[in-house]
Each structure stands twice: as C-alpha cells, then as structure tokens.
C-alpha cells in the first residue's frame, strides 16, 4: 500500500535564523523527508519582526485577525492550516520560549476559534546553554500552546528505539550534541508515524 505524503512545517522560534534551534528543527525536517514527508521551515523571528503590532492586545473578541491581515504572519497561519505535523523549536529564555514564538502563538486566537490546528501533530525542540538549562520547561510551554490549539503532542521516542521523553532537548552548540541529534532522528520517525495514523481525523 502506498503511504500518504505528510506535510510537516518547522517553526524556528529563535531570533537567530542560522543558530542552534534552526539546526535541530532542520534536522527533524530532514529526517521527516527521508520518511516520505514534504517539509517547510519558517523563521518566526523574521515573520514577527514584520508585524506593525508586535503583540496581541485582544483588540477584538472574537479575534478578527485584523492586526496581521496581509502580512507574513497571515501567510504563516495559512501554511500551518495545510500541515499535518508541526515542529516547534525555541531556545531557552528564562526557562521558557522566546518572545517571538510566544507572540506568534498569542496571535493564534482567530485560528484557534476556527480549529485550524486541531488534531495536527506537534513536536517540541528546545536548546539551552547548559545541561540543565530549562529545556524541559521550555518544551512544556510549547506543549501548553499546542494543547490549547487542540493539537496532538508526541515526544522523542519510537517503537524501534525507546519511549523517549518530552521532546528534543539540546545543549548548545547543537551541532556537537550527539544525543540531541539522535533524538531528532528518532522523533522524526514518530512524528511522521502519528501524522499518518491520525490523518483521517484532520
């Protein structure tokens, strides 16, 4: 039986376009491609820098999306609407996600009402400056944002490997973190697997 082609979107939540977070998100996407998925990488720092109104002010209820209409953020949400899976990545900022990534998710009020991310499969990737540098609390923050949008969350495990943990956690420089790279490879298999298994409910 021919496998369905899944569409996986990576969100680099770092303000650095070519940094540690981008490297690991790209690694996951690269591995997803090996398992037959189509992929796209979006740099949230650039996208949010284009916003005239940087942060959600809850200016309307329900949200009309007026603050990002005609911008790259609107295009980003349209891309996410088409996705089967989403890889969310962020460096650790005081034990949580970057301001850019948080600001983007704060602006998902309209797409949340319309259930654009409902039953899409999410995976978290975080990079810290030290071994116990807030990576898991950063992943938890990502999980909260994904759960509130009705997403299905997977960790970094796979049946042929192990159950994994919260997601991909790395210590910078990520290019030298062999365990994080290994977890990225494993998590890609899991992400594509669950995307395929849940395709009928999206």
Model-derived segments and spans:
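N-terminal beta1-alpha1-beta2 submodule of the flavodoxin-like/Rossmannoid cofactor-binding fold
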Residues: 1-111, 159-202
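Short, glycine-/small-residue-rich phosphate/pyrophosphate-handling segment
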Residues: 99, 113-162
């Amino acid at each position: 039986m021919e496998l369905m082609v899944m569409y996986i979107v990576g969100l680099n939540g770092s303000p650095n376009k070519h940094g540690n977070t981008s490297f690991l998100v790209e690694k996951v996407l690269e591995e997803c491609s090996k398992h037959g998925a189509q992929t796209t990488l979006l740099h949230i720092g650039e996208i949010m820098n284009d916003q005239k109104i940087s942060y959600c002010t809850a200016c309307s209820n329900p949200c009309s999306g007026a603050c990002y209409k005609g911008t790259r953020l609107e295009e980003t949400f349209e891309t996410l609407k088409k996705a089967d899976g989403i890889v969310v990545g962020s460096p650790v900022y005081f034990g949580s996600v970057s301001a850019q990534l948080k600001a983007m998710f704060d602006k998902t009020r309209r797409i949340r009402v319309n259930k654009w991310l409902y039953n899409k499969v999410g995976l978290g990737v975080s990079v810290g400056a030290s071994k116990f540098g807030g990576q898991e609390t950063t992943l938890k923050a990502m999980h909260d944002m994904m759960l509130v949008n009705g997403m299905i969350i997977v960790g970094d495990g796979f049946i042929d490997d192990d159950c994994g943990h919260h997601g991909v956690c790395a210590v910078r420089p990520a290019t030298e973190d062999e365990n994080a790279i290994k977890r990225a490879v494993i998590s890609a298999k899991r992400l594509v697997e669950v995307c395929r298994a849940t395709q009928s409910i999206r």
